[in-house]
Amino acid sequence: MRLLKPAWVHHDDKQIFSVDIHKDCTKFATGGQGSDCGRVVIWNLLPVLSDKAEFDADVPKMLCQMDQHLACVNCVRWSQNGQNLASGSDDKLIMIWRKSAGSSGVFGTGGMQKNHESWKCFYTLRGHDGDVLDLAWSPNDVYLASCSIDNTVIIWDAQAFPHSVATLKGHTGLVKGVSWDPLGRFLASQSDDRSIKIWNTMNWSLSHTITEPFEECGGTTHILRLSWSPDGQYLVSAHAMNGGGPTAQIIEREGWKCDKDFVGHRKAVTCVRFHNSILSRQENDGSPSKPLQYCCLAVGSRDRSLSVWMTALQRPMVVIHELFNASILDLTWGPQECLLMACSVDGSIACLKFTEEELGKAISEEEQNAIIRKMYGKNYVNGLGKSAPVLEHPQRLLLPQGDKPTKFPLSNNNEANQRPISKQTETRTKDGKRRITPMFIPLHEDGPTSLSMNIVSSSGSSTTALTSCSAAIGTLPAAAPTESAATPLMPLEPLVSKIDLGRLDSRLKTQPASQRRQSLPFDPGQSNELLRTPRLEEHQSSTCSPSNLNVTATGKSEFVKAALDYRLHVSNGHLKTQHGMLAKVTASDSKEMLWEFYVGSPLVNLNLCEKYAMLCSLDGSMRLISMETGCPVFPAISLTSSAVHCAFSPDNSLVGVLTECGLLRIWDIAKKVVSLAAGCLELLNKHGTAAQFSVTNQGMPLIGFPSGNSYSYSTSLQSWLVLATKDAIMYHGIRGTLPRDMDQMQQKFPLLSMQASSQNYFSFTGSMELRHSESWQQCAKIRFIENQIKLCEALQSLDELQHWHKMLTFQLATHGSEKRMRVFLDDLLSMPEPGISQFVPKLELMQCVLDTLKPHSEWNRLHSEYTELLKECKSERQKDIFATPAPPQQKTASSAGSSPRSGEATGEEVTEKDGATAVAAAVVAGSRMAVTTGTSTTTTTTASSSLSSSGSSSSTSGSGSSSSSSSTSSLSVPQPAPSLSPEIQTLDSPTVCIDDEILSASSSLPPLDTSPVEVSPASTSGGAASTSPAASVAGSAPVSSSKTDQT
């Protein structure tokens, strides 16, 4: 083994937080702090390994330096294919780098410093609200996982950057590490909340939470990088505790048992990294036995030491103390070489070069896939939801229902099935301690395949067996006895003696892990699906609020929420008083602390925006706080139960909350009134706890569930609207209709954002094939778009409404008929329907539809026809849209004892504006007079009546403000119709239209007698009303009259 520390690898004496070796072992990347920025550097690996290349001036050492990050880079990771490099930083961004042709200058040097390779940022991923601490590419580069101090893990679609597939919320502390299961079935994340969460990648639900090994841990590490073994059998965590001493916890895939760990480091373990491949080595005893196969991993700690472990050894292969001057933060293995690199906060890296005799040789990818197939029945590269779920134990399909699987024993001699697999050899050391040596079961062609792992679990002298064969062997059905020549494990003393092992700290006297932790027995016949916690207990949060925290009245927990420049730090159980525990909330911005707030009950949920902070407690109380001053905006509100989600509308004018018992409330903050009060208990009973919750600017709630269903509430229908379902219609409808800039249009497209984020689109991508004819697909897509239009009208989402009208136009132009197209266009030319569609600007949509239809040459005739109709409609509506007659009204008998027929003009027309400005005019000898003022007017028609002033004459001045009433009836004035198009505008100044002649307000009107006029009773002959040829126009003084009868 050679230990190399190249001094020329540095970040100008700044910290290096991450290192990763490229798949071809020709280069490696480092990430850390630069000069007032975050820095990513790609280095040539050859000068590190070769002294000749190091001193050759023609061999470049630094290949490329990228300083585009605004803050320190915490993690760099190469993709599996080596084409992409991902970097995560304190600036909340993730950048995806790709190599481009030519060379470039180092950013910020003015071209003085040249890069030998050109790497450019092709994608910038935005979604985290805090520092990004760790990254991990999935097998086959399907996804990229990132974790942050905002307590979330985001799954990015690596095939469609910058789209995200899911946001995993469940941690209540800073998430400091993520790792993919090599089979693609699970994703593990480790957090400061003293837990590891296992997520199911098939539906991104929480599968299991592991807390026991971390109960004594503190948040003393910058990162917590955990790692899966290459065979998928074991997950090794970072910082754990055993008997007061730091350990690296071993978690078995079978039942998630946690009874074994690596011990010996004096301070917290910060990072763990398995070699990417299963290693093999021929035994050195000269026997012709098959090669020994095992896994290898490295462990780094805050005690500045590095240890390398092999599953075929009872002790660490090598331990190097004081390798750096500060904590070790990252580790990486060379996939093609026996190479290990580590980096430290002190700004340096170290490289350990092993020989194949020392470390072993990596088996080929085909051999590793064969091992995976034998253990799981499927090649792991097809996992991650791209096909059927990985079957953990395919032999179970062969078992009759009700039968229990039997063990398939193996022996280490030619006598078949003489001893059970758990047989071990036990010896005594000189000091009286027991040494238990497990029997090694090598890989062979005829029997089940496994990797034996012997791991130090307490002190340096005693070992505990961890055999992956127990999972596979324990589930095989009974079969004919098979002879196998198992080779007992050899300690490989000659190999170990060549290397200075060093000594782990022997002062740690810990009890065996089996005594410390009691794991539930795992039934091999029980599916792993049964080990999940109930869905109703998984309080996953929405995209708009942190998750509902699992806290108790006396429990302690901390979490941070950030938005823009503001940051809220919550500490439950901060202070203990004689009346109970107090929770503390601290608000700060980028410069200073703003305020402190104490709550008498633990906080289980909170959210914040630019103006306000929402605090929800365990006792069901809710507090709305001003972010600037910390003063309450609302008094404390009591809810029926604690809040699961809370969210602000995008414009910060509304705030909503959803409780555990299904209570939904939305408040208007400025008016301090409730905007919506509803219940969704029936939805919770049907789908479980809500996973997403948000509020639109129009006050519409959007609720999403882990099942893929999402809903919104309609106050007019008093019902829940179905926004999304997880079926083929939804998948095919959304497919191909997402805008290219969807990530920037989430606030303008609330419906589509909810549908895309509820896993209806991404969970089907690549896993569902449409094998049937296209006829149903075309019909289904058109009907889906039509339903989307109705949903947009209900949500009052105008931008989305225009988008779906374009989509429907394109589909009808491509697959529709002329009859169907005409029905669609005629509807847009019609007047808006009362109720939910009043806000729809139909003429604007019509223009948009015609623009979309114009490129289709086969529809030119229809386009020209409806273009002319649109022009005529605009012209007519400009004249009539604000003078729409009121619905026919019935009245009591007039003084003449008769009433006019429905729909006929009878007496006079009175026009008002907002109840304040009005101009009254009489219709003389059947002539019609309409008055238009400002931007909207209304016209009412009364029955036969007499108009008189209240004892004084009226004068006309300015635009005039008057009110008129009938002596025989009183009619309600309908609300004005909204403007449907920018082209339809009222005139800037008031105008009076008399017999189709338009006069401006400044024009001189014909002289009118302003004295009171007696109007003769209406005549019913011929159905027409007759009046005296005189009229009065009221001026600034209102005209009042006595009412004798009212309808």
Swiss-Prot record:
It is found in: Nucleus. One of its GO terms (biological process) is regulation of DNA-templated transcription. Keywords: Chromatin regulator, Nucleus, Phosphoprotein, Repeat, Repressor, Transcription, Transcription regulation, WD repeat. GO terms for molecular function: chromatin binding; histone chaperone activity. Residues 933-972, 1015-1047 have a biased composition (Low complexity). WD repeats lie at residues 11-53, 68-107, 127-166, 170-209, 218-263, 264-319, 323-364. Residues 401-435, 509-549, 882-914, 933-1047 are annotated as: Disordered. GO terms for cellular component: chromatin; germinal vesicle; HIR complex; male germ cell nucleus; nucleus. The modification Phosphoserine is found at residue 519. Residues 409-424, 509-518, 889-901 have a biased composition (Polar residues). It holds the Pfam family Beta-prop_CAF1B_HIR1. Belongs to the WD repeat HIR1 family. Required for the periodic repression of histone gene transcription during the cell cycle. Required for replication-independent chromatin assembly. Promotes remodeling of sperm chromatin following fertilization via the incorporation of histone H3.3 and histone H4. This is Protein HIRA homolog. It comes from Drosophila melanogaster. The lineage of its organism: Eukaryota, Metazoa, Ecdysozoa, Arthropoda, Hexapoda.
